[in-house]
């Protein structure tokens, strides 16, 4: 088997020199704590994940393969840095257990010959064999290599012959399976004649991903799936560099920019994403972006947030691969250069902050293509964070939430757009063929502004444009309030609904126009206004067994043109929201905040913010 896939023995041994310098000393401490915790838990076995599957846990084998991969990598790296027989022996045991599984296909994908679990296990096996080569008996090593051939290469080729769907899609399944299998096949090239064909097919399948990956490096499946996708892509890129001196993946479109995408949607280290995997992708392999492209912002982000979690025994390698891949000659600033308004045109997402690196006030908005993978009826949706706490939230809507839904809740969410911070009309969901876009963006001394066009998502003849304006103190650059102004134009008399979702406790005032949202640490004051009569109610719903949401549900009737203003502020808003529209434009007043818009041919344009 080819050696030195991600690093050779000399490189692993040289990592010991890093442990006395910052930040590697902290990374190594986290790695040792994780490895010590792994020793206190039982090894991962097929019996375990099958029992979990029988209790109804989805992806039990895939998660077990992922955890095994992380354990093998971290234990092996820690052993190479500071030789420890217990770490070495446990890594070998985890590897032996993995290779003894009867299948590397998750039971939830039992109609496939190969799946994500196959790739996770195959990569874990070949890297583990490589890094533990001298610690495994030759006969056992041969058995492990045979397991990769029988449980990964052969099933993968069978899946391609069966024209499996993931080979031709563009999203994370494509990259995880094809990149993981390309890496494993490349390592197995001297062991099995099928490896060359498997690698060729895997790389051919990845062309669909590269064709869809935009120059701005954004990913329409959100931060969690971005991490899953880019992690496997980078591991393959590093293997190509080490085994073939091939840098073609690193030179592909968008990869030099993609490291910035998750930073803008994880303010203060908390995900503000728009998908059903809203996680912070703080994976050790992501340091390869900082290493290859000298992205100081990526190194800062990972240094700042990846060590802030308690050690666990599950998941991928974080600290181990951070020790291996973090550049040691990159001067990382305490205040990275990040834009206070950032748009990603390829997917129609945008983010704004009063200041970086630790925003006091932050908002994110999402438009884009409603036909993408994991799309939701959340065109023009918004999220809001105040002092690190998410106050207006996009909740993940997965299988678990449906299981816990009451009948009344199910009826309410039959219009799934109601589950998001957006607007729907006539009880219609957002149209699957809609393509929205960010049409305006601006950062000024005392404001931030983006405007989003829903692209017909609310139905034929309905135009929905959402403005998100942040009022910022010109001297301190501290955010004061976020004003959301919705332009809704409809050629027919129809009911509209606007929803704002939160984890906090909502208290609606008697006038029905002002409210407070009390979070764990912060309270947000809300004021609502419209150019037509509206009704505002507070609803609550159960997301799953341990999480509930509250929402402000605004309803009204519209024919022609309607403006709705929603103001979110850290301080109480002294007066109700006033909206005045004229031939010249529109003015929104909330307390001492005054926002002026000028009229253009297609939509309003921000002209001034005063407070």
Please identify what each model-predicted range represents.
Residues 183, 354-356, 369, 423, ...:
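Short, flexible loop/turn elements at secondary-structure junctions
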Residues 360-363, 373-375, 392-394, 401-403, ...:
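Short helix/loop capping segments that flank catalytic or ligand/cofactor-binding pockets
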Residues 305-311, 402-611:
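CBM-like, beta-strand-rich accessory domains located in the C-terminal region of large
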Residues 4, 20, 24-28, 59-268:
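Aromatic-lined, polymer-binding surfaces characteristic
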Residues 273-278, 391-416:
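Aromatic/acidic polysaccharide-binding cleft in carbohydrate-active enzymes
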Residues 386-389, 395-396, 492:
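Conserved SET/PR-domain catalytic core that frames the SAM/AdoMet-binding pocket
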Residues 165, 188, 225-391, 443-444, ...:
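Carbohydrate-active enzyme catalytic cores, enriched for enzymes
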Residues 1-56:
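Low-complexity, Ser/Thr/Pro/Gly-enriched N-terminal "stalk/linker" regions
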């Amino acid at each position: 088997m080819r050696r030195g896939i991600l690093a050779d023995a000399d490189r692993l041994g040289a990592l010991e020199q890093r442990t006395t310098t910052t930040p590697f000393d902290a990374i190594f401490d986290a790695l040792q704590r994780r490895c010590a915790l792994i020793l206190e838990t039982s090894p991962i076995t097929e019996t375990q994940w099958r029992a979990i599957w029988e209790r109804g846990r989805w992806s039990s084998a895939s998660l077990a393969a992922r955890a095994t991969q992380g354990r093998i990598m971290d234990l092996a790296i820690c052993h190479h840095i500071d030789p420890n027989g217990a770490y070495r022996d446990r890594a070998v045991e985890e590897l032996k257990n993995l290779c003894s599984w009867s299948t590397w296909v998750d039971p939830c994908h039992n109609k496939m010959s190969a799946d994500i679990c196959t790739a996770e296990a195959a990569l874990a096996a070949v890297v583990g064999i490589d890094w533990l080569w001298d610690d495994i008996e030759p006969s056992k090593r041969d058995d492990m290599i045979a397991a990769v051939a029988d449980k990964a290469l052969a099933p993968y080729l069978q899946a391609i012959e069966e024209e499996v769907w993931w080979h031709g899609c563009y999203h994370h399944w494509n990259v995880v399976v094809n990149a993981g299998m390309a890496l494993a096949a490349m390592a197995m090239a001297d062991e099995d004649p099928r490896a060359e064909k498997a690698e060729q097919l895997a790389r051919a399948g990845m062309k669909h991903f590269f064709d869809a990956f935009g120059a701005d490096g954004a990913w329409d499946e959100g931060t969690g799936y971005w991490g899953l996708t880019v992690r496997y892509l980078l591991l393959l890129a590093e293997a190509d560099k080490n085994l073939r001196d091939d840098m073609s993946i690193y030179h592909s479109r968008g990869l030099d920019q993609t490291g910035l995408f998750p930073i803008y949607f994880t303010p203060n280290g908390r995900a503000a994403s728009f998908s059903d995997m809203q996680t912070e992708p703080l994976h050790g392999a992501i340091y390869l972006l900082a290493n290859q492209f000298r992205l100081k912002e990526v190194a800062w982000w990972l240094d700042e947030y990846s060590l802030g979690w308690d050690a666990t025994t599950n998941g991928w390698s974080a600290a181990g691969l951070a020790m291996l891949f973090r550049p040691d000659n990159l001067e990382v600033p305490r205040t990275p250069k990040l834009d206070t308004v950032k748009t990603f045109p390829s997917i129609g997402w945008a983010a704004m902050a009063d200041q970086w690196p630790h925003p006091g006030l932050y908002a994110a908005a999402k438009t884009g293509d409603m036909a993408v993978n994991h799309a939701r009826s959340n065109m023009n949706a918004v999220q809001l964070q105040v002092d690190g706490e998410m106050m207006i939230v996009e909740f993940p809507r997965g299988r678990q939430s449906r299981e816990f839904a009451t009948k009344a809740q199910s009826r309410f969410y039959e219009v799934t757009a109601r589950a998001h911070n957006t607007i729907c009309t006539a009880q219609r969901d957002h149209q699957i063929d809609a393509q929205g876009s960010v049409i305006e963006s601006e950062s000024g001394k005392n404001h931030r502004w983006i405007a989003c066009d829903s692209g017909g998502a609310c139905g034929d003849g309905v135009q929905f444009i959402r403005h998100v304006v942040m009022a910022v103190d010109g001297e301190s650059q501290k955010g004061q309030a976020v004003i959301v102004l919705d332009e809704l134009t409809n050629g027919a008399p129809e009911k509209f609904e606007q929803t704002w979702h939160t984890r906090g406790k909502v208290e609606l005032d008697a006038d029905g126009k002002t409210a407070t949202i009390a979070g764990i640490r912060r309270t947000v004051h809300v004021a609502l206004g419209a150019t037509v009569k509206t009704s505002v109610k507070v609803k609550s719903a159960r997301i799953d067994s341990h999480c509930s949401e509250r929402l402000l549900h605004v309803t009204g009737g519209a024919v022609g043109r309607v403006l709705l203003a929603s103001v979110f502020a850290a301080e109480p808003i002294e007066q109700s929201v006033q909206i005045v529209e004229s031939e010249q434009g529109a003015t929104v007043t909330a307390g001492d905040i005054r926002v002026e818009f000028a009229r253009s041919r297609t939509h309003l344009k921000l002209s001034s913010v005063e407070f």
